[in-house]
Amino acid sequence: MSGVNEIRSTFLDYFRDAGHAVVPSSSLVPKNDPTLMFTNAGMVQFKNVFTGVEKRPYVKATSSQKCVRAGGKHNDLDNVGYTARHHTFFEMLGNFSFGDYFKADAIELAWTLITKEFGLTPERLLVTVYADDDEAAGLWKKIAGFGDDKIIRIGTSDNFWQMGDTGPCGPCSEIFIDQGPALAGGPPGSPDEDGDRFLEFWNLVFMQYEQVEPGVRNPLPRPSIDTGMGLERMAAILQGVHSNYDTDLFRALIDAVAHAVSRAPEPATRASYRVIADHLRSTSFLIADGVLPSNEGRGYVLRRIMRRAMRHLELLGARDPVMYRLVPTLVREMGRAFPELVRSEALISETLRLEEGRFRKTLERGLAILDAESRDLSAGQNLSGETAFTLYDTYGFPLDLTQDALKARGIGVDTQAFDAAMQRQKQAARAAWQGSGEAATETVWFGIKERTGATEFLGYETETAEAVVGALLREGGEVETLKAGDSGIVVVNQTPFYGESGGQVGDTGTISGPGLKARVTNTEKKLGDLFVHHVTVEEGTLSLGAAVELKVDHARRSAIRANHSATHLLHEALRQVLGDHVAQKGSLVAPERLRFDISHPKPIDEAELTRVEEIANAVLLQNAPVVTKLMAVDEAIESGARALFGEKYGDEVRVVSMGRPVDDEGWEVEGRLPNFSIELCGGTHVSQLGEIGQITVIGESAVGAGVRRIEAMTGTAARRHRATESRTLSQLAGLLKAPVADVPERLSTLIEERRRLEKELADARKKIAMGGASGGGDEAREVNGVRLMARVVEGVEMRDLKGLADEGKSRLGSGIVAIVGVSADGKAGLVVGVTEDLTGRYDAVGLVRAGAGHLGGKGGGGRRDMAQAGGPDGHGAEAALAAIAEALAAA
């Protein structure tokens, strides 16, 4: 029972049998929790349950939570690989009570699990409790039979947990194991507590107070329990090893690394193998949860982890991408517990392969510069911060990678100077931005917004509205009026026009008044909530302070609404067909069509696209109302609404819910959530799904590494597209004199027949060419003591000439072959071949260049035994062969 997978199962099964709901791990990307870069503890997904904001259908839960600590204040990156227990990715086993059981049951459950199920010897165990927690100390004496020597009272924050300055809080009790006197270190609370002898593996948090303000705590009416056990630590304990990296899971990953680099681990390289094994887990799980490498936010942390692992692969001798080859081992070891790894295996592998290929050049350049700059430094000295910043800024070499590369030599980095250089760059960038023409145009909006305030958007409820003109601009500057023929920008106090954002294009329409007509050609948003209308005045004068009527182009808005709602249906259908790794990476919602970019590592085949389209249309046909609701952002996320990665949300968000869940065949089913699609979205949408009409996917293509683009149409545009396709298919059927259903097979047969005939024709031309043609007599002639076979061949492409030359050389045995091929469009290709016995005397490159000029070409290239050239003038074929013969005669 000591394997990692068995330990996880035993823990979860034990608490399931004790009445706990087994809850799957939440994503590593917290659901709109601005305080966290990544999920770093088991309680994160239950945070709102503990605070009472959210209700769930269970009061006891257990989970094995994926956690990452590699960014923000929870950052173990620098220590990973160099200690026995630091990781960027780890699993936290936990059991939770939301007002059900409390200390006595929590301690009883924990003690029974570790001594009965896991079989730990009680004599090796000890615990800590908070200094004032007499209740917990008494329970440990009663349940475990511990004396005071086994119950250590700690008065510091290590044994008192709180969520923040206010909210639930309470004392902790940590469980330790004595790993024996062979390891250094003393018990918790002693001066030597940082040693490895006494290992903490489970923390029980007793949430019994609510902190209303610093120093003021009130008892909670329903105390709760939050526990956390490190799976990797427990595996090391049960497997009798003192390092997490010696457990079965890490041994498998390290063996895979050793196989990939064809090198067994040694004491000097041990840290590199550990870094790679650890970082493989964190990078793979982050990608599976929708994070892709980038230069900011979570994507940048992912890139740093990737590049640190890749640098250690380079230390082990790898010169080609390796990390992607390790993914199958990880999936085999952890895929059963975390099926998202299986679903995302292709995306993970391709992302790692591409990123490692890109980083190879950066790594080579950066390490060369780092080596040169640090050559004269010795242990205890620091690399200059300016040099470290140059590596970062110019060569894309992260600071932590520089620090890691120098760590083995005992050399540090002047981080203060690095930070100062970074600050100077930011200041220079801001100054450059303010001095640019674009900036001069953009800064005008600050003054306008300060004067007029934000624009009130009315477009969710209406397409017409009256408003007052608050600002007019022409050619980047404010003006009092816009006259007939003028183009400019209008800012009003309220508007029904949607401003371009979130991938949805801006509205168009009209602004009118007495004697006034202006055409709105686009609408944008500036500074988040200032709507600016691009207009051309067609009649009258548009004046500052005037009352005007705004009217959105209804037909265009309707088409945009349909396309935007369709993107939501397609997004969810794509996730259902391709996997949960699919995340929106960009979109364009226009009246004519929609474009949708997603994270996916390979082309989406026709069968998958068909399933996506069928699922989306099945939901559309429900004609269910599209429900929009304003909610607090935390409440929205907890309700299941999908937040787009990288988007910034305020305290209140708009939640758009569509349709009822369906299976892959389009039949309605009971889903985990009440709606097929629930997203945070500020765009405009249809009121009933049936208004979309139909959804037709018209294309799929690559945008960049790991990103695919879907293009689709809806409504009338989709029907017209289908009608055009249908007419075209009918015309093809008529030309082929076949039923429509037989067109693909008939076309396939014709294409294969054409290929066969083309090959036969090419073969016939080759035979004719080598059997006798103009310019060469029946076989070959002797020039300067060398046999020369020269041919002009009609209708043979350049790609076939080399084969003819090889055949000619084979026939001659010893000699030179020169062939000019003239294509149907009159262009010429020239090939010269020299048999091996003559390459010491004659160079095919020189001979081909002698003839190329007569074909209108320049130069030519190849080897001494085979060279080629081309030109636009096939009429010079005979002259080219004659020139080659002359060059041969003169040699």
From Swiss-Prot:
SUPFAM superfamilies: Class II aaRS and biotin synthetases (SSF55681), Putative anticodon-binding domain of alanyl-tRNA synthetase (AlaRS) (SSF101353), ThrRS/AlaRS common domain (SSF55186), Translation proteins (SSF50447). It catalyses: tRNA(Ala) + L-alanine + ATP = L-alanyl-tRNA(Ala) + AMP + diphosphate. InterPro entries: aa-tRNA-synth_II/BPL/LPL, Ala-tRNA-lgiase_IIc, Ala-tRNA-ligase_IIc_anticod-bd, Ala-tRNA-synth_IIc_core, Ala-tRNA-synth_IIc_N, Ala-tRNA_ligase, Ala_tRNA_ligase_euk/bac, DHHA1_dom. SMART domains: tRNA_SAD. Its EC number is 6.1.1.7. GO terms for molecular function: alanine-tRNA ligase activity; aminoacyl-tRNA deacylase activity; ATP binding; tRNA binding; zinc ion binding. Binds 1 zinc ion per subunit. The keyword tRNA-binding applies. Pfam families: DHHA1, tRNA-synt_2c, tRNA_SAD. Its cofactor is Zn(2+). The keyword Metal-binding applies. It is found in: Cytoplasm. Zn(2+) binds at H564, H568, C681, H685. GO terms for cellular component: cytosol. It is an enzyme of class 6 (ligase). Its main location: cytoplasm. Catalyzes the attachment of alanine to tRNA(Ala) in a two-step reaction: alanine is first activated by ATP to form Ala-AMP and then transferred to the acceptor end of tRNA(Ala). Also edits incorrectly charged Ser-tRNA(Ala) and Gly-tRNA(Ala) via its editing domain. Belongs to the class-II aminoacyl-tRNA synthetase family. PANTHER family: ALANINE--TRNA LIGASE, CYTOPLASMIC, ALANYL-TRNA SYNTHETASE. Consists of three domains; the N-terminal catalytic domain, the editing domain and the C-terminal C-Ala domain. The editing domain removes incorrectly charged amino acids, while the C-Ala domain, along with tRNA(Ala), serves as a bridge to cooperatively bring together the editing and aminoacylation centers thus stimulating deacylation of misacylated tRNAs. HAMAP family: Ala_tRNA_synth_B (MF_00036_B). This is Alanine--tRNA ligase. It comes from Methylorubrum populi (strain ATCC BAA-705 / NCIMB 13946 / BJ001) (Methylobacterium populi). The gene is alaS.
